[in-house]
Amino acid sequence: MDNGMLSRFIMTQTLLVFCISMTLSSHFGFSQMPTSSVQDETNDNITIFTRILDGLLDGYDNRLRPGLGERITQVRTDIYVTSFGPVSDTEMEYTIDVFFRQSWKDERLRFKGPMQRLPLNNLLASKIWTPDTFFHNGKKSIAHNMTTPNKLLRLEDDGTLLYTMRLTISAECPMQLEDFPMDAHACPLKFGSYAYPNSEVVYVWTNGSTKSVVVAEDGSRLNQYHLMGQTVGTENISTSTGEYTIMTAHFHLKRKIGYFVIQTYLPCIMTVILSQVSFWLNRESVPARTVFGVTTVLTMTTLSISARNSLPKVAYATAMDWFIAVCYAFVFSALIEFATVNYFTKRGWAWDGKKALEAAKIKKKERELILNKSTNAFTTGKLTHPPNIPKEQPPAGTANAPTVSIKASEEKTAESKKTYNSISKIDKMSRIVFPILFGTFNLVYWATYLNREPVIKGATSPK
């Protein structure tokens, strides 16, 4: 009885273990089936796309443009600016870092598959036809290759291709500097096909004239300019090889004036004011006024030279040149004014001394006449002399005293005519005229240039 119960218990345990093992094995078997099926499906997709690409490139000639002999190839373009600047005034160029996008349709690359878009490796770009785009006003362009070539290529199932690359471009920016430093410029970026005329390849903007060129919010790298906006357009040029379309994007810049106010304008204004301090010094202070005049002239010369160092050597005068020239004229005029005052001061002293000497001579003659009359009256009178005094000898102090007193009075009169610490009439006028003229000039200058809208040739202003 005990043996039977024991055998039943063992059989029950064995059956239970068998059921559990079967359950576990069946569970793990079903859980692995989807994984293997997904892997098989992935491998199948890779195989399909590999066959698609091999089939697309089989017999493909990248030397021929799409639609050759049938239609004009249309290339749609747009630009995303990641970094704008710096701008060089001396070289008249600017640097820009962009994502340059081009899109076109190539019917030879149509495919049918489980996906509508194929993201492709950049190596495939060398095996298919791509537009021969070049930048007309580019001085130097760099295609980034770190860590791999910064290029993107996508293929739609209808044969539409998107080709994007990252470029750093140094381009020419013609500048008209007549209004410098209150000037504005439109720096162009021009590109188009190098070999294909309009009869074969045409370029159009992808998103119209408003959103085809976009600048990142933190993309400005400008210290002396404000980036006011950008506009796009197209140009057509005719050459001996045909008519070509040029895509143009203008970046509108407005110069910041703060740096030049601190470095040039304020020093010039202070130098002119300093030169006018000499009008308030005595005209006899020749050394002090000479130092004022010469120092301010040399200072203005130094400022004019340093102001030109940050500009290209243009043949015309800028707004800053006119300001410096007028300030230089005021400073130089102050020096000439002092020379004039000094000249007339010395001449006035000489003229006053001459008049004093002539007046002294006239008085001397009058006194001699009076003295002669008194002497004659004294000699003709009936005077009795002591016996011990001869008659020929005049009384003591009557003959030499008038002569000595006349000479002393002449010298005192001549010296008294030289009035020191006096104010020249020219200085009085200069104290009023010079500040008024300089203040009027500043009002006219700043009102003219700050309120005038700069004219930019060859570009429309951004809206």
Swiss-Prot record:
Glycyl lysine isopeptide (Lys-Gly) (interchain with G-Cter in ubiquitin) crosslink residues: 355
Tissues with expression: Expressed in brain, in hippocampal pyramidal neurons.
Alphabetized InterPro entries for the sequence: GABAA/Glycine_rcpt (IPR006028), GABAAa_rcpt (IPR001390), GABBAa5_rcpt (IPR005435), Gabra-1-6_TM (IPR047024), Neur_chan_lig-bd (IPR006202), Neur_chan_lig-bd_sf (IPR036734), Neur_channel (IPR006201), Neuro-gated_channel_TM_sf (IPR036719)
Residues with attached carbohydrate: 45, 145, 207, 236
GO BP annotations listed: associative learning; behavioral fear response; cochlea development; gamma-aminobutyric acid signaling pathway; inner ear receptor cell development; innervation; neuron development
Signal peptide extent: 1-25
Keyword Ubl conjugation: yes
Topology in membrane: Multi-pass membrane protein
Binding site for 4-aminobutanoate: 101, 164
Pfam family for this entry, one: Neur_chan_memb
Keyword Glycoprotein set for record: yes
Cytoplasmic side: 341-428
Region spans: Disordered: 387-408
Subcellular location: Postsynaptic cell membrane; Cell membrane
Ranges facing Extracellular side: 26-260
UniProtKB keywords: Cell membrane, Chloride, Chloride channel, Disulfide bond, Glycoprotein, Ion channel, Ion transport, Isopeptide bond, Ligand-gated ion channel, Membrane, Postsynaptic cell membrane, Receptor, Signal, Synapse, Transmembrane, Transmembrane helix, Transport, Ubl conjugation
GO CC entries: cell body; chloride channel complex; cytosol; dendrite; GABA-A receptor complex; GABA-ergic synapse; neuronal cell body membrane; nucleoplasm
Gene3D superfamilies noted in UniProt: Neurotransmitter-gated ion-channel ligand-binding domain, Neurotransmitter-gated ion-channel transmembrane domain
Catalytic activity, reaction form: chloride(in) = chloride(out)
Molecular function as annotated in GO: GABA receptor binding; GABA-A receptor activity; GABA-gated chloride ion channel activity; ligand-gated monoatomic ion channel activity involved in regulation of presynaptic membrane potential; transmitter-gated monoatomic ion channel activity involved in regulation of postsynaptic membrane potential
Cystines in this chain: 173-187
Quaternary structure (record): Heteropentamer, formed by a combination of alpha (GABRA1-6), beta (GABRB1-3), gamma (GABRG1-3), delta (GABRD), epsilon (GABRE), rho (GABRR1-3), pi (GABRP) and theta (GABRQ) chains, each subunit exhibiting distinct physiological and pharmacological properties.
Domain observations: GABAARs subunits share a common topological structure: a peptide sequence made up of a long extracellular N-terminal, four transmembrane domains, intracellular or cytoplasmic domain located between the third and the fourth transmembrane domains.
Function text: Alpha subunit of the heteropentameric ligand-gated chloride channel gated by gamma-aminobutyric acid (GABA), a major inhibitory neurotransmitter in the brain. GABA-gated chloride channels, also named GABA(A) receptors (GABAAR), consist of five subunits arranged around a central pore and contain GABA active binding site(s) located at the alpha and beta subunit interface(s). When activated by GABA, GABAARs selectively allow the flow of chloride anions across the cell membrane down their electrochemical gradient.
Family, per entry: Belongs to the ligand-gated ion channel (TC 1.A.9) family. Gamma-aminobutyric acid receptor (TC 1.A.9.5) subfamily. GABRA5 sub-subfamily.
Protein name, entry field: Gamma-aminobutyric acid receptor subunit alpha-5
Organism for this UniProt entry: Mus musculus (Mouse)
